[in-house]
Amino acid sequence: MNSLLIITACFALVGTVWAKEGYLVKKSDGCKYDCFWLGKNEHCDTECKAKNQGGSYGYCYAFACWCEGLPESTPTYPLPNKSCGKK
C-alpha cells in the first residue's frame, strides 16, 4: 500500500519537475514579452496561464516574462529563424 502511494506521488512530481520553462515569446516577431515590475508580476502570470500558452506560473525576470510549467508545444525564446528586431 505504501509503495503504491509513493509511486503515485513520484508520477505526479515528474510532470512538475520536468515541465518546460523559459521566456514567453511572440510568434509574430520572435521578441520576448516585456515587463517592468520584476518578480511577482500579474501581467506575466496572466500571459503564462493563458489558454494558448498553458503555463502554471509566470513572473518578471530580467525585464521579460519567464514562465514555468509550460507544455512542450509552447514556443519559448529564442525562436528558430526569428531574431527579435533583426532582419
UniProtKB/Swiss-Prot annotation:
**Can you say where in the cell this protein is located?**
Secreted
Q: Does the keyword Amino-acid biosynthesis apply?
A: no
- Is Signal one of the keywords? yes
**Tissue specificity note:** Expressed by the venom gland.
- Indicate the impact reported for residue 6 to M: In CsEv1C and CsEv1E
**Limits of the LCN-type CS-alpha/beta domain:** 20-85
Q: Which residues form the signal peptide?
A: 1-19
Q: Which family does it belong to?
A: Belongs to the long (4 C-C) scorpion toxin superfamily. Sodium channel inhibitor family. Beta subfamily.
- Protein name in the entry: Toxin CsEv1
